[in-house]
Regions:
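Sec-dependent signal peptide recognition
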Residues: 2-8
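C-terminal motif of bacterial Sec signal peptides marking the signal peptidase cleavage site
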Residues: 13-16
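Bacterial signal peptide processing site
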Residues: 18-21
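Active-site-adjacent loop/helix surface patches within enzyme catalytic domains
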Residues: 24, 28-205
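Second-shell loop/turn segments in exported
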Residues: 85-86, 110, 149-152, 175-186, ...
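Acidic, His- and aromatic-enriched active-site or binding-groove loops in soluble protein domains
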Residues: 123-124, 225-252
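Acidic/histidine-rich, metal-coordinating catalytic segments
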Residues: 204-219
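Short acidic, glycine/serine/threonine-rich helix-capping segments at coil-helix boundaries
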Residues: 259-269, 276-323
Length: 328
């Protein structure tokens, strides 16, 4: 019995030594040069497009494969049947459309949005042609919104279609004011047709067609005050806009409020609560603090682009009330 125990112990010691030796002697992998491989082509079958290869980083949970139509499981030994398809209890992931500008030219926009950690579902160039670039499957999550919020929805990458628009953004003048670049008419026409198509297919309401600055007002300015939201609303029935008669109806009381109550904490809280109820992510502080100024500025970019100084004047207040009443 002792001999058996001795031999067993010896074997364990030898195994342990060999294991330790293997750990110590393991060599670091030799660096290799990565080869540039041409991307696989999109496959076309009838009217359907398919992309069957993942060229993204799987370790980061990224995947470029597009299955198209209905995606079904394929369990071994069992058949998936669609006898009772579809269930009524389902909805679209796509609940918002978020519009951005790239702050880059065409070439750089394509490179950044396809080769780095940011992306969008679509890219609209500033070229006067008949092409719109698709970069991400609509059923996939693109990385365009970042930390974001609108009403009760957060992290809008999960629930939105992102559209990037080629536009160089803004420069800052000697007084510190941002001067934005205009959008050519042919580019706006592309955007309008694209947004109309997406919003119709996914039944996205006007209240959920937003600027990046709307959902991230303390971080972002795009697509800026020169983006023609009013034109999109009046010409294409896209997005939100106020009714002029309602604005005029609210203006006298708004003028009195901003004249007599401007520094009153309860009035400031009322303003903040109205912005929050409308959709903006804002803390109720009762102060004209930095975050409140950023929210006002983002609102002005969208709905009062003639003056976007971040100060609540009578016109801004009357427009906010008209919108809050219209889209409550």
């Amino acid at each position: 019995m002792r001999k058996v125990l001795f031999i067993t112990s010896l074997n364990i010691i030898l195994f342990s030594c060999v294991s330790q030796k293997n750990v110590v002697s393991s060599a670091s992998p030799t660096p290799t040069t990565q080869k540039i491989v041409e991307k696989p082509k999109i496959e076309h079958h009838g009217t359907e497009d398919f992309y069957r290869v993942n060229i993204a980083d799987s370790a980061k949970n990224n995947n470029t494969i597009s299955y198209g139509s209905i995606v079904s499981a394929k369990p071994k030994k069992y058949k998936i049947t669609k006898t009772y398809f579809p269930s009524l209890g389902q909805g679209f992931r796509q609940r918002f459309i978020i519009l951005h500008y790239t702050a880059l030219d065409n070439e750089k926009s394509i490179r950044v949005l396809t080769q780095q950690s940011v992306s969008s579902h679509y890219l609209v160039s500033d070229l006067d042609d008949h092409e719109i670039y698709q970069l991400v499957d609509e059923n996939k999550r693109a990385y365009h919104a970042g930390i974001s919020s609108w009403k009760n929805s957060n992290n809008l990458n999960d629930s939105s279609i992102g559209i990037e628009i080629v536009n160089t953004g803004y420069v800052v003048d000697s007084l510190g004011k941002r001067l934005f670049q205009a959008f050519p008419e042919h580019q706006i026409e592309k955007i309008a047709v694209l947004v109309k198509d997406i919003s119709k297919r996914y039944m996205i309401p006007p209240t959920n067609i937003l600027a990046h600055s709307d959902i991230a007002p303390t971080r972002k300015q795009d697509p800026g005050p020169l983006f023609p939201w009013k034109t999109l609303y009046e010409k294409h029935q896209i997005g939100m806009w106020y009714d002029e008669d309602k604005k005029q109806e609210f203006y006298p009381s708004a003028l009195e409020d901003t004249t007599t109550l401007y520094e009153d904490a309860s009035f400031i809280r009322k303003i903040q609560l109205t912005f929050k109820s409308f959709g903006y992510d804002i803390q109720i502080t009762g102060m004209w603090d930095k975050q409140t100024k950023s929210v006002i500025e983002a609102f002005q970019y969208h709905f009062r682009p003639e003056n976007y100084d971040g100060i609540l004047d009578a016109e801004t207040w009357s427009i906010l009330q008209a919108l809050a009443q219209k889209y409550k």
